[in-house]
Amino acid sequence: MKNLFFSAYKKVFSYITSIVIFMVSLPYAYSQDVVVNTTKHLFTVKIGTTRVIYPSSSTKGVSVSVANPQDYPILVQTQVKDEDKTSPAPFIVTPPLFRLDAGLQGRVRIIRTGGKFPEDRETLQWLCLTGIPPKNGDAWGNTQNNPKNSSPTMDIQMSISTCIKLLFRPDKVKGDPTDSADSLTWRYKGNYLEVNNPTPFYMNFYSLRIGDEKINLSDLGSKDEIKNGSYVPPFSSRDFIIPVKNKGKATEVFWQVINDNGGVSREFKSTVQ
């Protein structure tokens, strides 16, 4: 009787073990047979300029060319934001949302809707365009290069926003930033190099060096809480971190600024006070 019990027990145990082994092996076998393809699609917009000058006298607004550099269609969302890139600005962009087919160009128009701006200086806003992927099931949203491929595919779609400067310029402000870029003054202030802008223009730096050392235009340090990039606003000042090798040693500073057309000025030079 005891032998019969152990014999039956061994058969049941062997059967259960076989099931467990099969269940453990099944995912492994499946992972060996099925290949999951991964694709990545960017949804971005190329803007035909690096900055937009909006004259205060404009009644019809200003237009900007845009392009779809991808080989598949995208939706383009347009908006204007305040200098902080968060708050809405008193401008509209038409069309606010539109489809742009692969490799094609289009135009958007920026129109002021209100707002009270200083008359003695420029005001900075941001024109932002965002490429938007299709939703599941949208007929226009097929980005697959090989739709007949039977292998499962994980499609990573990345929506990218591109923002450029929109400079509202009063009629009283004449000329180009490069005409008065040599008016900037510089002085040492602790571990920082301070630049003062006495002009009505936003001075957008292309390059900056003190002595032979280049200054990192994107490194504002912990002192400057406003992440305003590589520019100094009108009638304002800002600080740059001084390279360690040149703290208080170099006496000359050199810089280039970007003009209204996105070009680069000649190099200016001044003595550090």
UniProtKB/Swiss-Prot annotation:
Pfam families from the UniProt entry: PapD_C (PF02753), PapD_N (PF00345)
Signal peptide extent: 1-31
Keyword terms of this UniProt record: Chaperone, Disulfide bond, Immunoglobulin domain, Periplasm, Signal
Protein's gene: psaB
Record has Chaperone as a keyword: yes
Single GO molecular function: protein folding chaperone
PANTHER family assigned to the protein according to its UniProt record, in alphabetical order: CHAPERONE PROTEIN CAF1M, PILUS ASSEMBLY CHAPERONE
Lineage: Bacteria, Pseudomonadati, Pseudomonadota, Gammaproteobacteria, Enterobacterales
Function: Required for the biogenesis of the pH 6 antigen.
Gene3D superfamilies: Immunoglobulins
Family recorded in the similarity comment: Belongs to the periplasmic pilus chaperone family.
Record protein name field: Chaperone protein PsaB
Location (main, coarse): periplasm
InterPro entries in the record: Ig-like_fold (IPR013783), PapD-like_sf (IPR008962), Periplasmic_pilus_chap (IPR050643), Pili_assmbl_chap_C_dom_sf (IPR036316), Pili_assmbl_chaperone_bac (IPR001829), Pili_assmbl_chaperone_C (IPR016148), Pili_assmbl_chaperone_CS (IPR018046), Pili_assmbl_chaperone_N (IPR016147)
Gene Ontology CC: one annotated term: outer membrane-bounded periplasmic space
Keyword check for Endoplasmic reticulum: no
Cell compartments where the protein resides: Periplasm
Gene Ontology annotations of biological process type: cell wall organization; chaperone-mediated protein folding
Disulfide bonds: 128-163
Organism of derivation: Yersinia pestis
